Every structure is written in structure tokens, then in C-alpha cells.
Amino acid sequence: GAQGQHVQEKAVTLAAARDLKAALERTGRYRVRLTRDGDVYVIHGRRVQIARDAGADLFISLHADAGSDPALRGASVYTLSEQGAGRAVREFTKGDDWQRDLRLPGRDASVDRILLDMTQRATQNRSAQFARVLLTHIEGDNHPLLRRSHRDAGLAVLLAPDVPAVLLEMGFITNPEDERVLSDERARRRLMRSVAEGIDRYFREPAAPVMVAGDIAGG
């Protein structure tokens, strides 16, 4: 991971994840599963699988950005790109039991593929909705945002076809002020409270639920 002047990305992201977990669990409305709770590396595909196995309604990957220009600072959020969506479908349908994994009938591969595409489109829409809400809450707490703060990419942690997901770059660990915020317990917890408030708002907003393919197939 990235290295700041005084702290490492892997340390501040784990601390932030624990802060966010505590903030969400205090509400009594959420069950939170961390993909790691120590100084271990979890491969990207395994992180996605942990979320899917848990039946997650939302997946957030926390990171700290790095850049060659120390003046660069601010948070940004990534959601899955169209190119990444195509990759996700190809990766997901490699296995022999992908239809069973999504509770599809398995009688007609072309129909099942359409249902998978519908599921993924709904998931992408919900991910984008959460990204907008999240950025609003982060900015509202006077935390700086990177220019063009909502971005898309084909990142491996965003590839689940049925779990809305974002990657949050909390700031630039190579910027002294962002590094201070991420390494200072009080400032970091304040940022994570903003994230928790964004999650609350996301789940309160009226929106069509993400239909998994098996639900669509079943009518």
C-alpha cells in the first residue's frame, strides 16, 4: 500500500474501517463484516466473496491515495466502469455453477445471461446512487474532495454483480494535511461518522431494490 511521511496506508485504512464499524454498530441498525481485522493481505477476489457470502447490502473498500505532487489532496469515490462491468460478467460466468450462484433456473443460458445483465445494471445504479450520497456527506463535513471526485474504473473489488460497491479514497496520504486527518484519531473518526451518515441516508432514500437474478427469474 501507499506510504506517507509518518504512516502507512494499510494502518490508517484498518483504523478507519474499525471506526466506521463502531459508528454503524452503535446505531443498532447494521451488521458489519470486515474483510480483515489485522495486518494481513486479503486478495481482491476474496474480499468480494466475503461480501457476497455475507449477503451484504453494501460493500465499501477503504483506501488512502498517493501522488507524486504533495499538494494533491481530497477524497474521491470509485464505482464500476462500463468496461469493468463487461469484465465482471466474463469473470463471473467462467465457473460452471454461476447460474446456481445467482439462483437462476439454468434452463436457457441466453436468458440467464440477460438476467445477470439486469442484476448487474441495477447494482451499478445503486452503487452510483450511494457514491453521490457519500460524497455529499463527506463534503458537507468540510472534508475536501478531489476535483472530479466521482470516478469509475474496473477495479477488482467492485466486480460483484449483485452487491452495490464503492471504493473510497479517503484522501492523499502523501499530502501532509490529509495524512494528519487520517492518522489523527479524532479527525479520522469524524470522517467515518460522515461516511456512516451517508450510509444511513442511502438506505433511507426511496429506490428500487437490487434484484438478484434468481428473484427476477422467479417473477
Describe these PLM feature segments.
Residues 68, 116-217:
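Active-site-adjacent mobile loop/cap segments within catalytic or ligand-binding domains
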Residues 110-114:
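Short, basic/glycine-rich phosphate-binding loops at helix/coil junctions
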